[in-house]
Regions:
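Bacterial N-terminal signal peptides
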Residues: 9-18
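Sec/Tat signal peptide C-region and signal peptidase I cleavage site
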Residues: 19-23
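Bacterial N-terminal signal peptides that target proteins for export
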Residues: 1-9
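Subset-of-secretome marker
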Residues: 25-411
């Protein structure tokens, strides 16, 4: 059971790391912004990499409504994370180096050549946070039936990380864990020492090697084509500058946030232009040539025909699609990124109408109401470089690193 807990803990920590201020993109996209606006955005981004302590609140939500073939009329998940965060000097330096990695290859190189960065980051990073998860009733019922255990619609998991020990209040989490019945209160896991041991034993080098698309495909077994396709797509899209020609950024009207003047930058992605571009064709053909899409992959002739159809029907198919991000920057010096959000929303009405007309979807499977996919993320930052008091729970039971590693080896 502890090996499963270890995997879960790593996922939780990685989730919290996704909105680390020091991991901000090194060079923001400026597009056609004027010099002053680009300088403001760039300076704020650079300042974020020197933030040693702050508070943050994040929201991640996904919603599927009225999709043909989906056994649920609606499935929604909302994850909220809030807390205080701090880094010591070594962790901040490590985070700055990790933040400079802009591609899958960069990350793999750091894992292979500098595993100590990950050790320094986790041993010197502290936080006191809570993760709140809310799922729709239909989805909770479906998950419960599949898992054979009652999945609640709401779940709260308090977390504290300090001195390399991750403390988890398992009171609400325990009923969902195998063998967790009766567990409650705080449990501390020596995660920092586990990461140190993993680095010493070459686990990071092995993980870096497994990030190679060919290795992923070989490890995928029967699903090797899918694994290779996913890795190929990730590699193709790992360069943040590769698709800038399909992006636009504008400075919208400034806003007031708790008495602070905030500049608002909105970046949009032109999906229709992208899928009509040579870059999109090259991306797909690269996957075809690699064999990642399997024996039924489209041929060059298929792609040419498909591109012609997209040119005719694309506006109808994608008229309900929005893909944009918003960055909020404090205007007064020192400027910081006080908020970021992303939105992918697709009203599928046009696509489903066309599918019904072609006979791809039977009339009796067409949704009667709204049909859409929406994914939203938001992060708000504050209290930059102010002292954050992060205390460890006094009554926590500690699980030693040796016990965690021994359990992982036997499972």
């Amino acid at each position: 059971m502890r090996s499963k807990v270890l995997s879960l803990l790593l996922v939780l920590v990685l989730l919290l790391a996704t909105f680390s201020t020091a991991l901000a993109q090194a060079e923001p996209f400026c597009g056609d912004l004027d010099e002053a606006d680009c300088a403001l955005l760039t300076t704020a981004t650079e300042n974020m990499m020197d933030v040693a302590s702050y508070t943050a609140g994040a929201e991640y939500s996904a919603q599927l409504i009225g999709l043909p073939g989906l056994p649920l009329s609606e499935a929604s998940v909302n994850v909220m994370v809030g807390g205080a965060f701090a880094y010591d000097d070594a962790a901040l330096a490590a985070a700055q180096q990790l933040g400079m990695a802009t591609s899958q290859e960069d990350i793999a190189a750091l894992m292979s050549d500098s595993p100590e960065l990950f050790v320094d980051f986790y041993n010197g990073w502290s936080f006191d946070a809570q993760i709140d998860v809310v799922v729709s009733e239909e989805l909770a019922a479906a998950l419960s039936a599949d898992a054979g255990v009652a999945i609640p619609t709401e779940l709260a998991v308090p977390l504290i990380l300090k001195d390399g020990i991750l403390y988890v209040d398992v009171t609400e989490l325990a009923p969902l864990m195998e063998g967790g019945a009766g567990m409650e209160g705080w449990i501390g896991f020596e995660l920092g020492r586990v990461i140190e041991a993993a680095a010493e034993q070459g686990a990071f080098e092995q993980a870096a090697a497994s990030m190679d698309p060919e290795a992923m495909a070989m490890a995928g077994g029967e699903d090797a084509a899918t694994a290779a396709a996913l890795m190929g797509m990730a590699a193709a899209m790992s360069d943040p500058t590769a698709f800038e020609e399909f992006q636009t950024i504008v400075r919208a009207d400034d806003e007031d946030m708790d008495g602070m003047s905030v500049a608002v930058f909105v970046t949009s992605f032109d999906v229709l232009a992208f899928i009509s571009s040579p870059q999109f064709v090259d991306l797909i053909m690269g996957l075809v040539d690699s064999g990642a899409l399997g024996p039924d992959a489209p041929t060059a002739a298929d792609l040419e025909q498909g591109m012609q159809m997209l040119g005719l029907m694309g506006p109808m198919l994608f008229q309900g699609l929005t893909s944009e991000s918003t960055t909020m920057v404090s205007v007064d010096e020192p400027s910081y990124i006080v908020g970021q959000s992303t939105l992918f929303s697709w009203d599928l009405a046009g696509l489903l109408q066309m599918a019904a007309m072609s006979g791809a979807i039977p009339a009796d499977e067409m949704p009667s109401g709204e049909s859409k996919i929406e994914i939203f993320t938001s992060v708000l930052n504050g209290d930059f470089n102010e002292a954050q008091e992060i205390e460890t729970p006094a009554d926590a039971q500690i699980v030693p690193a040796e016990a965690m590693m021994q359990s992982a080896e036997t499972n």
